[in-house]
Amino acid sequence: MYAVIRTGGKQYKVSEGDFLKVEKLEGAVGDTVELKDVLMVGGETVAIGTPLVPSASVVGRIVDQGKDKKILVFKSKRRKNFRKMYGHRQPRTVLKIEKINA
């Protein structure tokens, strides 16, 4: 069984037992998170939502809270000797998908 969920403005295809790196979710390591934005559930039969599948949810456990790799941004203007480099590390959460409720 698999599901397509929406979190952090992105869509992910998940199955039970998968590890998923998503935008930061509130909660401590070990907490359970229920994601209710389920767009599609598949298996023997496929249920496609309009836009969400009613009464479907995905349960996951927070494995890690941390930061992603550094993203470098470089700006320059030609012929003006203007160069600027900066970056940031986006906060992220790692989830382990435990159960898909369809």
From Swiss-Prot:
UniProt keyword RNA-binding, yes or no: yes
Keyword RNA-binding in annotation: yes
GO CC, one annotated term: cytoplasm
InterPro entries: bL21-like, bL21-like_sf, Ribosomal_bL21, Ribosomal_bL21_CS
Source taxon at top rank: Bacteria
UniProt subunit comment: Part of the 50S ribosomal subunit. Contacts protein L20.
Name of this protein: Large ribosomal subunit protein bL21
